[in-house]
Amino acid sequence: MAKIAAIAPDETDEIIYLLNEQSDVNELKKLPKNKLRLALPTVCRRVDKFKPLIETLLAQGYKKWEIGNYWGLSVLPKNGIDLSFDAPLYMLNTQAMQMAKEMNAGRVTLSVEDQLDNLGLIAAQAPLPVTMVVYQDAALFTSAACIRSNACKDCPRGEKWLKLEKDGQKYQALSKDCQTMLFAEQPLCFAVEAAEIKADYYRVDFVYKSYEAAKAAQVWNKVRRFEDAANCRKANLYRCL
């Protein structure tokens, strides 16, 4: 919550909050409901454990939702909600976007793995509103396998970060809820390029790694001016296939 508190709500169109099995419903009440979009995790091993939480939040009037995997469609109603597709649901052409629209998505997110030319092309021709991620600690992969060495029965299950290195490249692995996510040391930042992409929404993401409030505010203020944060990566933006 400290990261969010550092950013004035009136500077945002909405706040995306990533749910987990232990999410505290009372914590959500501290955020403006009209701006809150609830996101389901990309990988979920225990769908049944999420259902009571989702049903509670729907009953409390939360209408904005986001999914990063098709399992989310099995636990959310087909109608009556504002549904967004996150970047792991690849939108690499307008045909994929049209299919998302037919699946009742009201918004899609451009892929952080795409090239700059294609991002501009499909954003201009999109059949529904698009979001462009301009800053994110994007997971290199998410696995439903646990990286920890201890037995499951002895595991505290809380968040644990591990540092890894291979071929001179440094990585950070997040172990949480029996899953593993691998991250590069540097975040993605497409702020400079975003100035040329006519997206409907631009997204700054502080979801996984820990950010002090002052650091989050610094990044937020910089990328809002379409300026890159320091020490960032560009992923595949300029890669030629």
What residues fall within each predicted segment?
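Active-site pocket-lining/capping segments in soluble small-molecule metabolic enzymes
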Residues: 1-99, 103-241
